[in-house]
Amino acid sequence: MRKPIIAGNWKMNKTVAETLQFINEIRDQAETTDVEVVLCCPFTALSEAKKALGASKIKLGAQNMHWEDNGAFTGEISAEMLKELGVDYILIGHSERRQYFNETDETVNKKIKKALEQKLMPILCVGETLQEREAAQTFDVIKNQITIDLEGILPDSMKDIVIAYEPIWAIGTGKTASSQDANHVIAYIRQLIQEKYDDGISETVRIQYGGSVKPENATEIMNEEDIDGALVGGASLKADAFLGIVNF
């Protein structure tokens, strides 16, 4: 049985004070759920968030990292630095990183390898644009991303990787893939993992859906056979909405 995982991606939102208030508001309910809860905070809030979480079951996530250990990379942060702060999960390949910062599948692959080396658990984001979807290229795009992003990743490492299917056309737009459509693509991702590795790995890897997930549609999405969780954007910024998803 795959344990559901709900991750909130705050993007460039929340001050340290707002982060601490949010943690205080959700901690009790998030502690009693059987769902794994992850908060992907801005870099500036990670240290204080970790202190506030303490021995909580809620996991801490970061939103980006560089693939080098150190060096002349102004504005970047390394996996080792994140690990030192107590980070558990790391978003890699989010569509906004790919779109606005020219992140490629090759750099995504480097980041995954470095994250695993530092015992961070990657949440690998993949998904197609509206144009690619309308051109019936969704499966081709996903296959290319999975093939390159996981190049050289050993079978034993797959237990530490979460995959998030986030159709780019559904992020921040209010549009959502139907639960059936999302499950169809996620089942295909699971098939790709089976072909690359084996049945055991494909049946244990957790695959989330991301794209305008909110309390109103969380139950329907989570009831699909192959969907193991959600990567939540806007709805993760409000405690009541986020808890509504966590308690689907």
Curated annotation (Swiss-Prot):
SUPFAM superfamilies: Triosephosphate isomerase (TIM). GO terms for biological process: gluconeogenesis; glyceraldehyde-3-phosphate biosynthetic process; glycerol catabolic process; glycolytic process. The active site is at H94 (electrophile), E166 (proton acceptor). Its main location: cytoplasm. One of its GO terms (cellular component) is cytosol. Its EC number is 5.3.1.1. Substrate binds at N9, W10, K11, G172, S212, G233, G234. Homodimer. Belongs to the triosephosphate isomerase family. Involved in the gluconeogenesis. Catalyzes stereospecifically the conversion of dihydroxyacetone phosphate (DHAP) to D-glyceraldehyde-3-phosphate (G3P). This is Triosephosphate isomerase.
